[in-house]
């Protein structure tokens, strides 16, 4: 018998896909002078943080823990999952804040809780806003009801 726990490892991909589908169109409407591209602007690749293409929305899946373990322990029934999102721009801090607010609204639509309110940082005309989002995701949960 094959145990299918692959869903746990697909969560980050699904979240990035949802962000591309729902945040990018809103970002394009609100920031006409910036270039937002599906598949490029939102990334989970840490290597993209050096020599950053602006704007960049970096989505990092933090350690998650298994929840709802059964007696046999063969399947993963749920995970407590946390994501850190860094928005990096080269325009101004207020742009980073506004972009993160739009991204946060998509996370809230996916029923995530904001566990670390945005923190802000800047150095040499590069502005960063960071927040963390967490939720319990069960094996048969849908991240987004469309």
Q: Residue spans of the language-model regions?
A:
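A broad, low-specificity signal for short, low-complexity segments enriched in glycine/proline
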Residues: 37-50, 89-98, 120
């Amino acid at each position: 018998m094959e145990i299918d726990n692959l869903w746990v490892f697909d969560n980050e991909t699904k979240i990035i896909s949802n962000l591309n589908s729902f945040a990018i169109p809103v970002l394009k409407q609100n920031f006409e002078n910036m270039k937002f591209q599906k598949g490029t602007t939102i990334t989970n690749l840490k290597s993209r943080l050096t020599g950053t293409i602006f704007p960049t929305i970096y989505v990092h899946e933090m350690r998650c823990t298994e929840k709802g373990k059964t007696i046999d322990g063969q399947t993963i029934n749920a995970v407590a999952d946390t994501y850190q999102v860094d928005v990096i721009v080269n325009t101004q801090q207020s742009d980073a804040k506004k972009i993160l607010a739009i991204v946060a609204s998509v996370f809230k639509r996916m029923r995530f809780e904001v566990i670390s309110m945005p923190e802000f940082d800047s150095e040499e005309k590069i502005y960063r806003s960071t927040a963390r989002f967490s939720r319990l995701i069960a094996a048969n949960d849908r991240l987004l009801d469309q």
